[in-house]
Amino acid sequence: MTMNTPRPRSQPPPPHPPLFKPTTPPPPPLLSTSTSTSPPHDFSFAHYLSSPPPSVQRRGRADMSRTPPLGRVGSDLSHNNYSSKANQHRQTGSSSSSKEKDREYKAKSKASSPFFSGLGGSWRSGLSRDEEVKRKAKAKTRGLDVGQWVKKYMASMVEHLLASFSRHGGGEREKREQQRRRPHSFSAHGPSALREQRERWRRRRGQLSSAPASLRASPVNSGHLSVGGSVKVSTSSEESTMEELQSAIEAAIAHCKNSITVAK
């Protein structure tokens, strides 16, 4: 008897290779390794808690790129400290140099102050000397002006007095000339008039004989004698004009002296 032996089944053909390979990686498994031990209905979020989402990762990387590393921060701090110290040193150096300059300037000013003070004193003394010379010159010119004015005043006064004296003197001379030229007439009649006339002549001759020789020989008395008149050496008008002239001259001299003392 023959037994029906089963024929071996033919194996299926191998699958064809894919035409293109996917470039994106496969998504991570939703469940971790602990799912094998956990029941199927119990889900675990440990994977999500352990690895943050991609947006959070990108934000953290950007923040880290923005914040400098610790070494860079330390170098920046050291650089800032060095620059502040350099600025302080520069400021102290500039302040010390300014103080030294001030000291040098004060020393120079102290050294040059006696020289300038001497110059100022000499300049002031020169100015005072010039002012004194100007004042003396002004006083001198003022005195000269006063002297000139006094001289002019005196000259005008003398001219006025001489003119008045000449007028009065001319009138007196004219009167004397008229009396000298006038003929002597005897208005009396009879022997009594003749006797009186003779008595007068005798008295007149007696006065002349008793006078000194200088008076008799003077040119004033050598002229014609008027009848019944008296001998006059100087008239009252001449004496008054001479006194006025003398008083005016004395007043002018006193005024000149006073003006000269005031000018000095």
UniProtKB/Swiss-Prot annotation:
GO CC terms of this entry: plasma membrane
Q: Which GO terms describe its molecular function?
A: kinase inhibitor activity
- Compositional bias annotation for Basic and acidic residues: 98-107
Give the residue ranges for region: Disordered: 1-146, 165-240
Q: Does the keyword Protease apply?
A: no
Which residues fall in a compositionally biased region of kind Pro residues?
9-30
One GO biological-process annotation of the entry reads: lipid metabolic process
Fill in the PTM field for this protein: Phosphorylated by BRI1.
Q: Where is the composition biased (Polar residues)?
A: 77-97
Alphabetic keyword roster: Brassinosteroid signaling pathway, Lipid metabolism, Phosphoprotein
Q: Where are the transmembrane segments?
A: none
Q: Which stretches are tagged as biased composition: Low complexity? A: 31-40, 208-219, 227-239
Q: What does this protein do?
A: Negative regulator of brassinosteroid signaling.
Q: How does it assemble?
A: Interacts with BRI1.
Q: What is this protein called?
A: Probable BRI1 kinase inhibitor 1
Protein's organism: Oryza sativa subsp. japonica
